[in-house]
Amino acid sequence: MQWHRLRFPIKLTFAIVLSLLIGFHFNLETPRWAVMTACIVAGGTAFAAGGDPFSGALRHRGMLRIIGTFLGCIAALTIMIATIRAPALMMLLCCMWAGLCVWLSSLIKIENSYALGLAGYTALIIVVSVDANGSVLLAPQFAVERCSEIIIGIVCAILADMLFSPRSVKQDIDREIDALLVDQYKLMQLCVAHGDKEEVDRLWTNLVRRTTALNGMRGNLMMESSRWQKIDERMRALNTLSLALITQAAETYLIQDSRKEYVPPQFHIFFDKSVENIGDIHKRMKIMRRVITTSGSKNTPVTLQNWVVAATRYLLLLKGIHTNSSISRIEREVLKDEPVVKMRSAESRHAMINGIRTFVATAVGSLFWLWTGWASGSGAMVMLAVITALAMRMPNPLMMAKDFLYGMIVAIPLGSLYYMVIMPSTQQSMLLLCISLGVMAFIGGILIQRRQIGTLGGLVGTINIITLDNPMTFNVTAFLDNALGQAIGCFLALLVILLIRDTSKARTGRILLNRFMYAAVAAMSTNQARRRENHLPALYHQLFMLLNIFPGDIDKFRIALTLIIGHQRLRDADIPVNEDLSAYHKQLRHTADQVIAARTDAKRHRYFEQLLAELDTYQGKLVHYDAPLNVTEPVKRLANTLKKYQNTLIQI
């Protein structure tokens, strides 16, 4: 049996039991919030990771939950103070706040959006709970208690991780950076040999995903300890180098489509030999550097030269990452990075739809609840807020809503067993209560790390409906109201997601592809500050988004990669410096920007035709000013690419 698979269930059980004990020991009014928080922080991170989560990821999620809770409590108190005499307006403002938070959370990094999503539904939960209890004057006390209980739950989850063998991401990083470079070499082998196009596509898309994942591990590592600061600096540079290796290899393949003789025979012979580990790469790089020195730069393809330089720098940083040693003078030269450009989100319409879904779902639910006085309304409102706030940030919100619905359905019989049979029998013994909840948490932990659908929702839903109040009372009617309310709330959230369809997929894809086009056009510049800007991480981040939005659509990925290659080549090209070309570069950028900004296909088509005509004129100007081949060739390739894929870039 793989005993390490039991590590997370033990952590989850300890966190839940410890938060329960602390909650009852300090006489908290609703200890279940502490228990639920420990379950959500530890369980949600494990569900996302598909196993025992890294320590950094768990702590990061915990900190975001604290921030989101405080923001939500402040917003709830502000809204209640301002609209204390108008309950309907109060609920409407809370729904607007939830929608605003979801809209903003959809525009920022998904790692940090958790805090905003939480802030949105925390305010709604506080207002709903206070209204359900019928005493608005208790709102400040309720907000303070909620913050305290959530902090207790988070501390318990982090403490459990620290006690039971915390899983550091460092060893995974060490293994991945070695394996990544070996696979980068294999991609270059295939590109030099001009092998099967489908195999090349499979390799580079896999490398893009792994490079993105490796960059995510860097964030988890920094959450573990500040002693990894030097590794963080190296990994930032390593991310750009890995992306540069992919770009140079793909360009080598692309050039050979039109120039079979691009790679000299000696390099074909060199890359025929296979590599198995990082030691083989070291040996190959030493030989390659000698071959390039002997052959001379004029007889060595530019892409191969750039690839070898990037791989050599990668090896230099790799050693420092393994040892966490002080940064040497040579490394410092490599780490003198260019300013990294950050692009604004391409999912503005997707974010707007998410915000509208949240607002509509919570507003309709709250108005129906206030109008009818429905006993299960508060439970339904809580689940509506939670699902619409959290599910909307996921790549597949419908699947997450179904997961919660299945979980809440399972929670009804499971919660009934605990609430009506097990818990009344353990009223005289805290030990028996802890054992009974611990067994459920342990089994749930095993299923959660397997990503069993409905498990996380079922565990959280069960803990929510068995109340765990202090003092404990057993009101079966209230229990059934809560159980049915949260199940109905999940169903209504699922219904809203189905009715308000997200039609932004094609628009987002078109914006992303046109941004690749703009980046390639904007690279044609004689402005040194603009040429120094590092667009590569941002461009590949958008390519990664394209991979997720259109999985399996290899043609779109090829277009994007071709435009990224064009951007990198034009960025390094020796464009003649004169006022005429500089003015024309500005005109090209303006026209490309108009293509992105156009709101109709007709306008977009007109501006695109104008851009193609301007590129033809620009090529004539380059010939007139005797521009070298390393300028005219990539410009011609860019113009041909835009003509070939014109329809795709205008309308997906």
Curated annotation (Swiss-Prot):
Q: Where in the cell is it found?
A: Cell inner membrane
Q: Which domain of life is it from?
A: Bacteria
Role of this protein: Forms an efflux pump with AaeA. Could function as a metabolic relief valve, allowing to eliminate certain compounds when they accumulate to high levels in the cell.
Membrane topology, as annotated, equals: Multi-pass membrane protein
Q: Name one Pfam family in it.
A: FUSC
UniProt family annotation? Belongs to the aromatic acid exporter ArAE (TC 2.A.85) family.
Q: Does the keyword Transmembrane helix apply?
A: yes
Name the chain's protein: p-hydroxybenzoic acid efflux pump subunit AaeB
What organism is the protein native to?
Erwinia billingiae (strain Eb661)
